Amino acid sequence: NLSSPPRVKQVTTNEEAFEELALKRYDLIITMPGVDCSETFTQAKAMKRLYPYIPIVVLTPFSHEVSRRIAKEDLSGVDYVFSWLGNVDLLVAIIKLIEDKMNAEVDITSVGVQLILLVEDSIRFYSSILPNLYNFVLKQSQIFSTEALNDHERMLRMRGRPKVMLARTYEEAMQIYEKYSGNML
């Protein structure tokens, strides 16, 4: 469901990551914590200071221990934390969620695209529900796009699919709702 598959560059050390970021333009950083969760979040903050325009996602294995450690971390350097539950559709959902967040302002206020707001604070739950939600929305959009008369109209209908936004707190949900209340599904 991506117009073109993403290119992925894997690095094994923080030094390699910073070297790559200095050499090439990247649209997304996905980092996976090792044994020391704190180092991951410290490095994410350092990356965010240097590259504030690049979304940073932490992808963790699911365990109660990891969840407890994340609850104590400063998450200011990351845009999202997701729990890897073995569903590869999560990667597409992460990309789509970030695209939707970046495009929401123009697509919703100028074009009139609808918005689905998911309000959830459980990393494990939103990591499992978002791939299902996006699969449903994208399938419905594909069905709708088959009614188009030509390729251009088909692409416009696919791009006009409802946007999905994730709020992890009540305050965040209210802020999004107040901004886009006229376009909520």
Predicted feature residues:
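Two-component/phosphorelay signaling modules centered on CheY-like receiver
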Residues: 1-9, 124-165
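Conserved phosphotransfer microenvironments
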Residues: 5, 10-18, 22, 26-53, ...
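Output/docking surface of receiver
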Residues: 10-12, 34, 52, 57-125, ...
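Generic recognition of short, well-ordered alpha-helical segments
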Residues: 42, 93, 128-131
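Active-site catalytic pocket residues across diverse enzymes, especially alpha/beta-hydrolases
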Residues: 47, 51, 98, 133, ...
